[in-house]
Design a protein with these regions (language model features):
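ATP-dependent helicase/translocase motor core
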Residues: 2-346
């Protein structure tokens, strides 16, 4: 009799990784040359990053690449929650790192549990997302209904994420990461007035990290954009992690469904067009006063109502509408929406 595994790896992590392949991400094994030969101080996949850099900047030399790469490593050590690197990938350095205008010219990869290590301290995100070899996002998953010390898995992960942001040993990894997502593959439940379960995303921050839900308003449209999950891809991943026996288990097949809470969330946030929108227009650095009254740089991510409002305004403008009214509820982020609108629509 085959023993069934019921843990976050089999119930959420593997199904999530396989779902990302539906969205067009290529899977990298931990034993692949790209992962083994990465820059361990930043987790940049050197072979992919170099190839893409020299393709986008075909006038650049090998020496130019080496110089720019060293500049990135130095920038990621700065105490600026990644602001310098953020400006760099938005072409402020004079070089192109991401082709923002033609998404398919970029490469998209995922890998499981790539270690982020500095000295004796380390953490391993469940899934790391690489664009052109740059680890710009990661995803942490929790087992559904896992309660420890009176806390749900989501609440524990939120606290763990905040502690990582405060750890100077992890500065390079924090600064290069643009978006973090967490999920326990459960539907949202706000009945107790707090977000104890579900799927959330955030950007890195010094303090007061804000975790945002994503409640899809275009379900049919985004689901129709998914490609099929092939048996060959399932076999490849399960064999790679030595879990091929899962393939015949009914629960695993259920967790692979594209409409599961975690997978639906990943579609909403990691569909390539959506992710590029968030990375290009949905992140902002602002100076705020901390609890001591000191000015502190913070980073915020666009919330889902602001995203859908921005896209609705765009559709209205395309239809020739010149004026109108945007209705807001209290605390819905009117000022931030105005900023994001101007950045995107100008």
């Amino acid at each position: 009799m085959i023993r069934k595994e019921h843990n976050e790896f089999t119930r959420v992590q593997l199904p999530a990784a396989l779902h990302l392949t539906r969205l067009g991400y290529d899977y990298l094994s931990a034993t692949s040359e790209e992962i083994k030969n990465r820059d361990y101080s930043t987790n940049i996949l050197l072979s992919i990053f170099k190839r893409q850099f020299l393709t986008f900047n075909n006038y650049a030399s090998e020496a130019d690449f080496e110089r720019e790469f060293e500049n990135i490593r130095l920038e990621l050590e700065q105490d600026d929650i990644g602001c310098s690197f953020f400006n760099r990938i938005h072409a402020d350095s004079g070089y192109t790192y991401i082709n923002w205008d033609n998404i398919e010219e970029n490469t998209f990869h995922i890998a499981l549990e790539v270690t982020c290590q500095n000295g004796e301290e380390e953490f391993r995100p469940d899934i790391t997302v690489f664009i052109n070899g740059l680890p710009l996002s990661y995803i942490e998953v929790k087992q559904p209904d896992a309660i420890r010390d009176g806390k749900t898995g989501i609440n524990s992960e939120k606290e763990r994420t905040k502690l990582r942001f405060e750890n100077k040993k992890f500065r390079r990894f924090n600064n290069i990461t643009q978006l973090i997502a967490i999920s326990d593959n459960l539907p949202y439940d706000d009945s107790q007035g707090q977000q104890f379960q579900g799927s959330f995303y955030c950007s890195n921050a010094y303090s007061g990290t804000k975790f945002n839900s994503f409640k899809e308003e275009q379900e049919r449209q985004v689901q129709s954009s998914l490609s099929s999950l092939t048996e060959e891809m399932i076999d490849l991943v399960l064999k790679d992690v030595n879990r091929f026996a899962l393939k015949s288990q009914a629960e695993f097949r259920t967790n692979l469904e594209s409409a599961s809470p975690c997978n639906s969330f990943l579609t909403s946030l990691y569909q390539k067009e959506r992710l590029f929108f968030m990375l290009r227009y949905g992140l902002v650095y602002v100076e705020e006063r901390d609890k001591k009254g000191q000015i502190q740089l913070q980073k915020h991510a666009m919330r889902y109502p602001q995203y859908f409002a921005t896209k609705a305004i765009e559709r209205g403008l395309e239809d020739g509408i010149k004026k109108g009214v945007i209705w807001h509820t209290q605390g819905s982020g009117k000022t931030a929406l105005a900023f994001f609108n101007i950045r995107y629509l100008r």
